[in-house]
Amino acid sequence: MNRIQLIFNEKWAMAREDYYNLVSLILPSIHSGNFKEVEAFFEKDTVTAYASDLNFVGRWNLEDSGLPSDSVAVIVLEGTLYSWETFRLQEYIAQAAANDRIAGIILWINGPGGMITGLDNASKMISECPKPVVAYIAGACASAHF
């Protein structure tokens, strides 16, 4: 199932108004047959990650071999949480948990919620992570983000 179909067929955990706002952004393109524009809209990453260290300026990839010891993984959840982004979140948590140079994880959150697919697994990964995981709320933390 492609991402456009998922928008209309998945279950959501977000305010109805936020869902309608999302749909109102893509419906004009769908009605005009401009599916490439809609797909491009959903290609934007809403979950990203990097590692940082208090003693050094800069950011590293989570799996960078030059990452300083005792670094912290920062996983950013910005905007609507789509199911494919939840799977990316799970990948980042697994990478951070497996990296001996990463001491803990910060979830930097600002979003209205999103699709519920994969949230149960992501929640389990967070609660069972062998490293400390904390959340920093940088705005909204609603529904699926919570």
Model features per residue range: what roles?
Residues 1-144:
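N-terminal organellar transit peptides
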